[in-house]
């Protein structure tokens, strides 16, 4: 029996399953090249966040987790559940590929950008985050980077949790994972989150609609998974999750219906996966199919989401993946096929008729070590039903010139396909071409006197950016962006203290006008201090968010406005009352700084949370 249970665990930690690992140098990651490898062999800059990290930071949202990571800048139109944007290394929010268990998140069909404020943190057991182009591995969207959210649990057990906080915040949840018999594992989880929120419109600098009320958020989440080991080599699994979100925001009146105030968003999302894995000492393969369906309503709550004045963004997404990897020499070769179909239902507000977009991608990856030199490459061809074939490639080389020190050079191409709204919406243009990018990067990394560090410089040229033509009243390819940046990270211990440092310099500009791209801070400093003192686990976070620019849409013509820099401190502490019960407390924005990440939208100010978890 012990042998069988160990076998099930080993089969679960495959190149494609995403079972959580420790975040140290021996951590195994799967996102960089779609096969399992130690994180210290990945040539692209990579960050791993575990569930233990999330609990230590006491984050309440996925956005709160991501903002701590290198190369990340975020903007949000208020508090929990409000519209958010994720910028990686200065690229657009639509230039980051969001995966859930290796499958593209079905949330960006019409709008083109995934809003991580709507994804439940309760589902997140691990995040693997890759910076730089990855279209040669994954296809569209992976211009700035890839974020892979992994939902599978690391170990068996049952956890019950509850929390309260500022703005009437409440959270209640539970999960259990059990091994049945010798070779079957079952996981069930549920979560409920609610906050009354605060008025998201900032005072004194927004000419829009004044709506002095609280803008709250509520989420309900369910998750289930079943995994079975048929033999030493074959494993099958099925999993599903769904969530319902309701968000109140400061809305708008429509000129055609001046008595209707649209200020509520209701999102329903469900996803189902099923797969079969094969593993032996040299060869690994997985066949995975997935179906997801999302309905995103915006409406006047007095009239309901089915009223004619409501809007609906409804997308169905179908995915089939066949991924393979074989160990060769001192490395690995991977190859596979992706097929995806996105469908809009007739009646979707932004796309009146029903449309389908199909994409088939074939890719090849390779990683090989030759003495002190490591080479990595990937090539991919996508066949899209709208714009035809598109090819991408990338290559990297690392030279360990002194033991423990290496230089890495990389180049890659990437692209972003036009979304359904840009193609078929009210102002759509079905002749749009994909947005394209070329990125160069050079980096040094090493271990010096106990300090694990990395310094890199990069340039990203993005062409064919899609913009809106006011004269023609349609989308067209016109824009160009030139992004240059420097990124530095370091981690080290001093006695009982663990330090993590990050510095980002990003110069992201419109190549035609030389204007800075909005909502990107030119400089950021991030610092994390963790320690244990008398059984209390302490976590101190510092974040300097530099000056940014945004657009004031309340003026005509619109004007650029400057958002000042800010220094933010968070402090969190936890205490294990028993071996099963842990209590936690956190103060976010310790010094109650007043700042904005999106012009005209307030942030929460100082917030308190108190929570506890019981594990058995």
From Swiss-Prot:
The keyword Transmembrane applies. A motif (TonB C-terminal box) lies at residues 599-616. Residues 155-616 form the TBDR beta-barrel domain. GO terms for molecular function: ABC-type vitamin B12 transporter activity; metal ion binding; porin activity. It is a multi-pass membrane protein. Involved in the active translocation of vitamin B12 (cyanocobalamin) across the outer membrane to the periplasmic space. It derives its energy for transport by interacting with the trans-periplasmic membrane protein TonB. This is Vitamin B12 transporter BtuB. It comes from Cronobacter sakazakii (strain ATCC BAA-894). The lineage of its organism: Bacteria, Pseudomonadati, Pseudomonadota, Gammaproteobacteria, Enterobacterales. The gene is btuB.
């Amino acid at each position: 029996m012990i042998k069988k249970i160990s076998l099930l665990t080993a089969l679960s930690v495959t190149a494609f399953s995403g079972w959580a690992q420790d975040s140290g140098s021996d951590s195994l990651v799967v996102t960089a090249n779609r096969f399992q490898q130690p994180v210290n062999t990945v040539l692209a800059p990579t960050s791993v966040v575990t569930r233990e990290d999330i609990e230590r930071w006491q984050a309440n949202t996925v956005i709160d987790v991501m903002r701590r990571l290198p190369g990340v800048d975020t903007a949000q139109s208020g508090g929990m559940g409000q519209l958010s944007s994720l910028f990686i290394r200065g690229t657009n929010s639509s230039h980051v590929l969001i995966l859930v268990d290796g499958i593209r998140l079905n949330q960006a069909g019409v709008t083109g950008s995934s809003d991580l404020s709507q994804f439940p943190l309760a589902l997140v057991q691990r995040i693997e985050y890759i910076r730089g182009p990855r279209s040669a591995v994954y296809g569209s969207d992976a211009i700035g980077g890839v974020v892979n959210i992994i939902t599978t649990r690391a170990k068996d057990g049952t956890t019950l949790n509850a929390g309260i906080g500022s703005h009437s915040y409440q959270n209640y949840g539970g999960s259990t994972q059990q091994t049945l018999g010798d070779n079957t594992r079952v996981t069930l989880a549920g979560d409920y989150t609610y906050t009354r929120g605060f008025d998201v419109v900032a005072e004194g600098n927004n000419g829009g609609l004044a709506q002095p009320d609280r803008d709250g958020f509520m989420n309900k989440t369910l998750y289930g998974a079943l995994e079975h080991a048929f033999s030493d080599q074959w494993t099958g699994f099925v999993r599903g999750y769904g969530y319902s979100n309701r968000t109140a925001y400061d809305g708008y009146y429509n000129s055609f219906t001046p008595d209707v105030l649209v200020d509520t968003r209701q999102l329903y999302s469900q996803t189902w996966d099923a797969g079969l894995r094969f593993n032996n000492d040299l060869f690994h393969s997985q066949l995975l199919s997935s179906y997801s369906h999302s309905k995103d309503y915006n409406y006047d709550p007095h009239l309901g989401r089915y009223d004619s004045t409501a809007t609906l963004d409804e997308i169905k997404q179908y995915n089939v993946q066949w991924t393979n990897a074989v160990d060769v020499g001192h490395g690995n070769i991977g190859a596979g096929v992706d097929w995806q179909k996105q469908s809009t239902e007739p009646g979707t507000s932004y796309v009146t008729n029903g449309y389908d977009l199909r994409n088939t991608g074939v890719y090849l990856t390779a990683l090989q070590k030759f003495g002190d030199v490591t080479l990595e490459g990937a090539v991919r061809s996508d066949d899209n039903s709208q714009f035809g074939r598109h090819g991408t490639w990338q290559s990297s080389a690392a030279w360990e010139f002194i033991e423990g020190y290496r230089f890495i050079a990389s180049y890659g191409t990437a692209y972003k396909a036009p979304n359904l709204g840009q193609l078929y919406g009210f102002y759509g243009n079905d002749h749009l071409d994909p947005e394209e990018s070329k990125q160069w990067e050079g980096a040094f990394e090493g271990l010096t006197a106990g300090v694990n560090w990395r310094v890199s410089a990069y340039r990203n040229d993005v062409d064919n950016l899609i913009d809106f033509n006011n004269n023609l009243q349609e989308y067209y390819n016109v824009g160009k962006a030139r992004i240059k940046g420097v990124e530095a990270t370091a981690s080290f211990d001093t006695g009982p203290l663990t330090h993590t440092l990050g510095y980002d310099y990003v110069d992201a500009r419109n190549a035609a006008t030389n204007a800075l791209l909005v909502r990107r801070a030119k400089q950021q400093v991030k610092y994390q201090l963790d320690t244990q003192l008398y059984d209390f686990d302490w976590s101190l976070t510092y974040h300097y968010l530099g000056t940014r620019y945004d657009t004031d849409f309340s003026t005509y013509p619109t004007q650029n406005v400057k958002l000042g820099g800010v220094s933010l401190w968070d402090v969190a502490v936890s205490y294990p009352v028993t071996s099963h019960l842990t209590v936690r407390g956190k103060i976010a924005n310790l010094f109650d700084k007043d700042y904005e990440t999106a012009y005209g939208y307030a942030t929460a100010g100082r917030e308190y949370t108190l929570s506890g978890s019981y594990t058995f």
